[in-house]
């Protein structure tokens, strides 16, 4: 309906079913949706990955879902959008060992320099959100500086993680300007340059 809206599809690690039987049923549903709806409007598989912050007890199921959806992305020749929280070692191991065919994106990237370094080595893009604006994000400048501008994307992760000066309020897409401005400030470049480059990066990674 709207030319400028595109979609991604996947099972987030925070939505993994409680049993292996339910997981494979959900995976089959995702595969069916992706294959039926495959078009230029479906631009990635995601967000997929591992989240040990909320629930590490089902880590085996999370890994199974992650790997299966990487296989789906490879089959459909789509990039992946990765969610990784407190699981950087396992996340990197999986994407190294399962040969993701298309580079993807580390979404709402945790401000973890080692994770970012390895992601960049593997060719991934890094997407920054509201946390880089938080006053207690002391390492944000160092992490942003280590990512080349042609590998940066910006997002809000709405309705969560509202950036300063709206922290604590419901987030929405209009707040992405604060993320862009923070990157501009850290890299000492113009807001317009950040907007231009991140737009170009998104068009390239999603092949729009």
For each predicted feature, which ranges?
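Mid-domain alpha/beta scaffold segments of enzyme catalytic cores
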Residues: 1-208
């Amino acid at each position: 309906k709207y030319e400028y809206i595109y979609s991604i599809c996947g099972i987030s690690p925070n939505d993994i079913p409680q049993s292996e039987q339910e997981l494979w049923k959900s995976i089959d549903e995702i595969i069916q949706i992706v294959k039926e709806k495959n078009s230029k409007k479906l631009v990635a598989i995601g967000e997929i990955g591992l989240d040990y912050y909320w629930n590490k007890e089902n880590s085996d199921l999370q890994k199974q879902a992650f790997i299966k959806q990487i296989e789906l992305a490879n089959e459909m020749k789509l990039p992946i959008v990765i969610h990784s929280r407190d699981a950087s070692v396992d996340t990197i191991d999986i994407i190294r060992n399962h040969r993701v065919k298309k580079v993807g994106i580390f979404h709402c990237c945790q401000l973890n320099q080692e994770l970012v370094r390895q992601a960049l080595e593997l060719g991934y893009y890094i997407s920054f959100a509201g946390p880089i604006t938080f006053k207690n994000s002391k390492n944000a400048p160092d992490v942003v500086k280590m990512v080349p501008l042609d590998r940066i994307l910006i997002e809000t992760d709405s309705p969560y993680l509202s950036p300063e000066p709206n922290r604590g309020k419901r987030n929405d897409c209009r707040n992405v300007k604060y993320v862009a401005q923070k990157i501009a400030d850290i890299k000492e470049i113009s807001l317009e340059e950040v907007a231009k480059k991140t737009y170009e990066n998104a068009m390239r990674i999603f092949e729009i």
